Amino acid sequence: PNITVIASAVAIRYLRNIVNIDFKSQAVKMNDVLDLGGRTLKFISAPNLHWPDTIYSYLVEEEILFTCDSFGSHYAFDDVLMSKLPVEKNDDYMDALLNYYNPIFAPFKTYVLKAIATLSGLNVKMICPGHGPVLDARIEEIINIYKEWSTEDFSAEKLVVIPFTSAYGYTKIMAETVKEGIVMVNPNVTVRLYDLDIKS
């Protein structure tokens, strides 16, 4: 009952709302440090990865980064360390990494890139995510994969989808007019109309 919860200010606020009791707390922010008696934790703000209150914790002396959900996967094998991942399991792991990234981090690509930028000055020997293997190997590779996945490809086709339903045809005319306006402003955009009416 006398522990002190150390977290971002947002996390402390959320936790107070969840547990409905008061507790001792210490809010930490970007670059704050905590002396654990011979070991030092440095905190790195990483909002929306994938919670608004996320912070990374860096164990300075050991060069270990605790990243909450970042660089994680829903993947398990007979060991814990990435260096022990059998070569024949690599494709499964990479699929799991992507399947974890897409729903959790793809909506927050700009935040992923900001977090990666804050890591550029750190020596990291190990990443401990909340899920999946502990990255004691391939650290730079996995970070670069996240960076690649989070970098927008502006050469990709620009597409506008206009779904509509039209009981009497007027909404269809409006949708077609919007399409014409878009193409007039930018002829390099592909515009697709989708009639949502259910045909019997």
Regions found by a protein language model. Name each.
Residues 1-6:
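Active-site metal-binding motif and surrounding structural segment of the metallo-beta-lactamase
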Residues 9-13, 30:
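Short, polar loop motifs at secondary-structure junctions
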Residues 12-15, 73-74:
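Short gly/pro/ser/thr-enriched loop/turn and capping motifs at secondary-structure boundaries
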Residues 20-87:
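Catalytic core of the metallo-beta-lactamase
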Residues 45-55, 102-110, 192:
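Active-site glycine- and acidic-residue-rich loops that bind
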Residues 60, 64-65, 71-94, 103-156:
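Divalent-metal (often Zn2+) His-rich catalytic cores of metallo-beta-lactamase-fold enzymes
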Residues 98-109, 164-168:
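Short acidic-aromatic active-site loops that bind/stabilize oxyanions
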Residues 138-200:
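N-terminal beta1-alpha1-beta2 submodule of the flavodoxin-like/Rossmannoid cofactor-binding fold
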